[in-house]
């Protein structure tokens, strides 16, 4: 009997610029991947994408994405408010824990809103094992569905002497 792979379920995609990135469909797999990369010392050069339904929507639909209302999108003030709370109180804090950087506060943040979508940008610098790196998280909610896109990117940072 074959042993089950307990690692995160991920799809690897190459974008137009030739960059390879991992695409996740569940928040748990995404956080597991970040944690594993941090433990493997591969944390300072990651680019991955998460496309998922937020937990508060899945809870209300009894974990059935088919039951999620079409009205849950970036035009719904209630959806936007709950999504923003989820991102700031759960997603970003969980990323800081996965990166083993409790000082990561994502204090540099901005919001860009159009009719088509809402984008929140979070940036911060951190250091782990004396290796400084920059973390950028872009969270996008669109007007046509409740699926949320998270673009997570870390890049090495050099310290000026």
From Swiss-Prot:
Keywords: Cell membrane, Membrane. Pfam families: RGI1. This is Respiratory growth induced protein 1. The gene is RGI1. InterPro entries: RGI1, RGI1_sf. Belongs to the RGI1 family. GO terms for cellular component: plasma membrane. Involved in the control of energetic metabolism and significantly contribute to cell fitness, especially under respiratory growth conditions. Disulfide bonds: none annotated. GO terms for biological process: energy reserve metabolic process. It is found in: Cell membrane. Gene3D superfamilies: Respiratory growth induced protein 1. It is a peripheral membrane protein. Its main location: membrane.
């Amino acid at each position: 009997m074959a042993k089950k792979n307990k690692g995160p379920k991920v799809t690897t995609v190459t974008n137009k610029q030739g960059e390879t990135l991992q695409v996740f469909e569940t928040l748990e797999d995404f956080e597991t991947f970040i944690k594993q990369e941090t433990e493997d010392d591969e944390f300072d050069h990651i680019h991955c994408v998460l496309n998922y339904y937020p937990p508060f929507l899945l809870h209300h639909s009894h974990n059935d994405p088919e039951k999620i209302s079409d009205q849950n999108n970036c035009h719904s003030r209630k959806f936007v408010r709950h999504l923003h709370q989820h991102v700031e109180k759960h997603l970003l804090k969980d990323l800081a824990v996965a990166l083993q950087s409790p000082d990561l506060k994502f204090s540099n943040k901005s919001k860009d809103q159009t009719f088509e979508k809402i984008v929140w940008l979070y940036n911060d610098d951190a250091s782990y094992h004396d290796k400084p790196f920059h973390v950028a998280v872009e969270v996008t909610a669109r007007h046509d569905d409740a699926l949320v896109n998270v673009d997570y990117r870390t890049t090495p940072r050099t310290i000026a002497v």
